A protein has these predicted regions:
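Short beta-strand immediately N-terminal to the catalytic nucleophile in serine-hydrolase-like folds
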Residues: 69-71, 96
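A catalytic-pocket lid/entrance helix-loop region that shapes and gates access to the active site
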Residues: 88-141
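Catalytic nucleophile-loop/oxyanion-hole region of alpha/beta-hydrolase
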Residues: 40-52, 104-113
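Accessory cap/linker subdomain of secreted extracellular hydrolases
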Residues: 140-177
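Conserved serine/cysteine hydrolase catalytic core
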Residues: 167-219
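Short glycine-enriched nucleophile-adjacent loop
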Residues: 76-87, 93
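Conserved HGGG/HGGXW glycine-rich cap/lid loop of the alpha/beta-hydrolase fold
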Residues: 1-39
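Conserved acidic catalytic loop of the alpha/beta-hydrolase fold
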Residues: 49-68
Length: 219
């Protein structure tokens, strides 16, 4: 089963290229609120634990005894959390672009650190936020991404999404950047991602998944 990034990133056809269809039964799905899943960009009942439960429901629905779990970026966070919850169901984990949704990772990417590497993109990203609110950009964006003002919500969603997509790869993919010009794609991605970040992944404490994986073989 393939677990996409974000949260809120959705599945793309290119993700199938990781697997040989003659050898693997490839299962991809859009997590809550994004891609083809509905309701669109919904934050209610949208937590890490809801997604873990969804993965298990899919496995049971497809009558699969056990499976390999593949995830990158946020997908690696979710895969690890699922494996901690259902260790006997996972034949193996394939994780890339490891991200554990720890406070230091969020702060480095959205508050300081990455800003020194991509200063031009950073200035565009923070342009909509008043200087008085820039000490906590995740909080400032969340306020606007959950606003009843649709225009404000969508403009902030695009800035958030383009910042991440233009800086998460050394060579940004033109198609990905173009996709985030779409209000629908950007809104789901930014709202859901920011929702998870401001709630610290809905984990019991910072670094929970890293501390809890000691029971998994190979960890």
């Amino acid at each position: 089963v393939f677990l996409h990034g974000g949260p809120g990133g959705g599945v793309e056809p290119i993700y199938r290229q990781y697997f040989n269809p003659e050898k693997y039964r490839i299962i991809l799905f859009d997590q809550r609120g994004c891609g083809k899943s509905t309701p669109h960009a919904e934050l209610k009942e949208n937590t890490t634990w809801d997604l873990v439960a969804d993965i298990e429901k899919i496995r049971l629905h497809l009558n699969i005894e056990n499976w390999i779990v593949f995830g990158g970026s946020w997908g690696s966070t979710l895969a690890l959390t699922y494996a901690i919850s259902y260790p006997r169901i996972c034949k193996a984990l394939i994780l890339r672009g490891i991200f554990l949704l720890r406070k230091l990772e969020i702060e480095w990417f959205y508050q300081y650190g990455a800003s020194n590497i991509f200063p031009d993109a950073w200035e565009k990203y923070i342009s909509v936020i008043p200087e008085s609110e820039r000490d906590n950009l995740v909080k400032a964006f969340y306020k606007r991404l959950t606003s009843s003002n649709k225009d404000e919500r969508l403009s902030c969603a695009k800035l958030w999404s383009i910042w991440e997509r233009s800086t998460s790869k050394l060579i940004p993919m033109d198609k990905s950047l173009h996709d985030f010009q779409s209000s629908k794609v950007a809104e789901a991605f930014a709202r859901i991602e920011c929702h998870y970040f401001i709630n610290e992944g809905f984990f019991e404490y910072d670094g929970w998944n890293h501390a809890s994986c000691t029971g998994l073989a190979g960890c």
